[in-house]
């Protein structure tokens, strides 16, 4: 009879991956990042455990979208106050806070519970080509 082995927190090995977002399509890039954050690329994947790896994304300002989405895609946020809805287009958000575009796309692909919030903390997004995680020796993710 086969036994299913559930990995313990001590046995889970976390790797660091580096992703260059330059000239990549937003959705295709985000799905690959979300899969690595969840740990779906590992044979020890367990849906109810955080078995994923850390992902560093650089050049977030150079991510692309297809079609007319650059001028038509809207990002909404609300302050919680009456009339506090703010709407911003992809183009202006890309100039102002390019990290938020990738963060929101990946966050929507993770589970919407405490496990998803824990997995989202392993995503590090930077708008330039520099990042402060050189000590972790990140491996380039083939994407």
From Swiss-Prot:
- Ribonucleoprotein: present as a keyword of the record? yes
Task: Output the superkingdom of the source species.
Answer: Bacteria
GO MF term list: mRNA binding; structural constituent of ribosome
Entry keywords, A to Z: Ribonucleoprotein, Ribosomal protein
List the Gene3D superfamilies.
Ribosomal protein L13 (3.90.1180.10)
Q: What does this protein do?
A: This protein is one of the early assembly proteins of the 50S ribosomal subunit, although it is not seen to bind rRNA by itself. It is important during the early stages of 50S assembly.
User: HAMAP family annotated for this entry?
Assistant: Ribosomal_uL13
Q: What is this protein called?
A: Large ribosomal subunit protein uL13
Q: Which gene encodes it?
A: rplM
